[in-house]
């Protein structure tokens, strides 16, 4: 069971918390979900188009959304917020205007905050972006996976598993390759495991990257 299910949903309420915090009437629940997706897509597109760092990574670990009747509070957890912070007031103001246009919210105030995370390579989203960048630059998949594991070891994690699926290295038959370092106890609910699945488009086609990181045991 623990091998197949999404590790984040499996641990909600124990070691994982929700990234969206709000209440809605059952009839309006789908509208709230759609709004969240628009907010996250808008922020990611803005970061991608305006403040891309040299390695080609967005560096967003997660986006938390808290909604009240008259306020939408968005917290962006970033691994490399340097470029965003250099010109902080203008950047955030521009981002707020973009999100407000996307949502068309008149009666609600929008507030965006940026939080820097320590050990960015201990977060699977940022690590997946790193691997995707390597694969796009035609670096060998084994080399990319080993480098990713080296980076997580510096972030003091207890274990990592990386899986890449698709037409790896341009081979005609799609296959799945994976590597594990340390412990990754997927069946233990008390184990704090971070997970992400990421799609990367290469010249050979689409590849899927999945990363499990064992952070700690509670």
Curated annotation (Swiss-Prot):
Family: Belongs to the universal ribosomal protein uS3 family.
Keywords for the protein's UniProt record, in alphabetical order: Chloroplast, Plastid, Ribonucleoprotein, Ribosomal protein, RNA-binding, rRNA-binding
InterPro entries noted in UniProt: KH_dom-like_a/b, KH_dom_type_2, KH_sf_prok-type, Ribosomal_S3_C_sf, Ribosomal_uS3_bac-typ, Ribosomal_uS3_C, Ribosomal_uS3_CS
Pfam families named in the record: Ribosomal_S3_C (PF00189)
Subcellular location: Plastid, Chloroplast
Residue span, KH type-2 domain: 47-118
GO molecular function: rRNA binding; structural constituent of ribosome
Any Gene Ontology biological process: translation
Family annotation (CDD domains): KH-II_30S_S3
Organism the protein comes from: Draba nemorosa (Woodland whitlowgrass)
Lineage, top ranks: Eukaryota, Viridiplantae, Streptophyta, Embryophyta, Tracheophyta
Subunit structure: Part of the 30S ribosomal subunit.
UniProt name for this protein: Small ribosomal subunit protein uS3c
